[in-house]
Amino acid sequence: MMIDYLRIQKIIHWLMAIIIMLDLNVAQKFGGEMELLDRLESRVDHATAGMIVTFLFVLRIILRYRYGAPSLPQTMPLWQTYLAKLGHFGLYFLMGLLIVSGITAANFTNDPIVVFGLFNLSSEVDNLYMFELIRGIHEFATNAIIAL
């Protein structure tokens, strides 16, 4: 039985938390009065941070599946156990939703979003309706994670 999370699990946890908080700062600037080139650069920075978080998230899931998690205290009331598990599952679900909605939203714009200088998340399709719809889901997931 696992008593504590592995050191690598803790490192991934805090790296993800720090990158997500810094990335939220970048994302807050999208709605301002930025020049087009600055907005595109911010989107690339945001997407790059998102891809790093995606890698860490997948690694986190693999480690969780492989090594598990510490048991909750036996003295914890049943309702708290349920809420703790629900909150943890909700956080994982929302992180996955955030990743998928971010990548999908980028796919509905033809503005170049080249991550690591290697691949373009955007496409030839410029569908403002779908972009706004999926970006709304992305923003919802962001706000829900903040609320948790």
Model-derived features: positions:
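Membrane-embedded alpha-helical bundles that constitute the cytochrome b-like, heme-associated redox core
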Residues: M1-L148
